[in-house]
Amino acid sequence: MRTTATSPLSRFALVFALCGLIAACGSSGGGDGGAGGGGTVEQEAIQGKVIDGYIDGALVCNDLNANGRCDGSDPRTTTDSGGVYALNVPKGSTAPLVAEVIAGQSRDSDQPGVPVDISYRMASPSPAYSTSITPFSTLVHASGERNFSLAEDLVRAELGLPPRFTITMTAPADAGSLTQAVAKSIVTTLKTTAGTLDLSAANALKTIVAAFPPALNELPQLRITTKGNAPIVSKEIYVDATFSLTNPAASVQTYDLNGKIRGRGQSTWGQPKNPYKIQFTSDASYAKVPDFLGMKKNRNWALLADYFDRSLIRNKLALSLGSSSAFNDGLKWTSSGQHVEVVLNGDYVGVYLLTEDIRIASSRLNIKEMSDDPAVNDLDGGYIVEVDVRLDCYRGPDLDLQLITPQQVPFCIDTPDEEAITVNQLAYVKDLLRQVEQDLYGPNRIEKINPASFVDWYLIQELFRNNDAIFVSSDFMWKDTQAATNPLDRLLNMGPLWDFDRAAGNVNYFNNWETEGCWVSKPYQPNWISKLFDNPDFLALTISRWKQKRPALEAFVNFSIDTYARRLVVAQQRNFQRWPIFGLRLTNYYVFSSHDEEVAFVRRFLNERMAWLDKAYASPEAFNAMCK
């Protein structure tokens, strides 16, 4: 928190207000641009906290020479019993804040009255990022990334936390929470590395990660036992089951749950390693669960098998990218997924992605859930629809959730489903889809859609060259009520993203193993995306958003690939001992003999693809020549 020099602060304010009058107290050491011409440096007062618990007796400084410690002429102070500090710093200082937690002197409120046993340092990358100095802000600082939202994305990945997990701390985390457990593990690491860690070094984050305790490296485990060990043979009929979910990173590591399970999926269903749909029972056991591996609590989940994807990272990478700071301004919500190792009826069945399924809920796509009472006549949202060439949705004598538009685009009305939708709601959403299409193919207007959502969805799909994204299947859209707070939510939005296991070169048809050439923008079949590019405003928006997102996109993709591979290094060996499919041709064009080679191909494909798309998105003329 920044304050004016006359604002009331803690007991330290007066000292540093006076210090600001003395040139030596506030002189810059050259690591920050706050000094000017050797004269007196204008000061400003900041106030913050040092937090794991509240840290009392920690030395805090503005690290003007950026050497990762409090020394020289760095303005400094000491925290009080509430972890609070007040400090005068050069006005506009972008230099890091460093907290030195001192053995025998500093105390953590999580262990009242007990001095800290080992000295360690924490940091915040700058006062502008946060004046709270925490275990998480230390990793953000150690990343060296000055795009702080991107840095938080990267830190979450290293910690095995889902994309939307909050890592900002303004107070100690709740006792027993995942946040508290992970923060404690980070502090353990900072103590372990205290003698060698240089917080100012370019490789500081790598040094910290290399010393992570097992709790931050091991994958969670999900043990499923069906009633009577019954086999799961249907995508429609659930089997009762019990579930035991263990997260090594959490304080309470294991939760036992009741529920049911069935098959799911299309091409992967029927393969040796099957995908599943899980629904937990809302009972006393479920009530005790605060979250699912850091993902928001919900009863409904998908277990993605990723059988065809021998890197095991394509779905997680694409979904995490959609949730990242690079794309979450255009895509309102994207499913999160966490890698788990699954044991089914005592049989180890490999690495899966425990994934939020697509549904309207406060913990998922947070738009209005309409009344199913015809008398209410709730019509204008929210809806979820899917483009699906299989038309795999309900069609009965009274209700038909299938729609083939005049341009032959095949839709399924996903939400509300056949048990909840009213006749008037069904008519409303079908008419909306026809109107949007008529605007696109007639006067080429886009007033009824949120163009940023269509652009961002397209950019990720085109980057991954996703075979299904030309309006084949798993291409979702949604609309909220006309009373939604955000006006863009009242329009038809593209998303959420889904189904990337056979993307990023992992397919042997339509040349989609190649990194050059546009795919989603081509009119291979009825495809609104292709038609949208006839609108010059949509094309201009696509080019500008690509250029805006490009630096963060490349950093996120490469960093995440490294991180996922690191976290999978042991578990993938068990997965492929169970499923020895390296060297086999499934749906893939290229054949590789190891997990390392599979991961390297994903990296090469996406980096070469980004480089090619740079050329395609260089200008409208380039796009029209290369992508239409």
What residue ranges belong to the model's regions?
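Short, well-structured beta-strand/strand-turn elements
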Residues: 325-341, 466
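Zn2+-dependent metallopeptidase catalytic core
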Residues: 243-249, 313-330, 424, 438-441
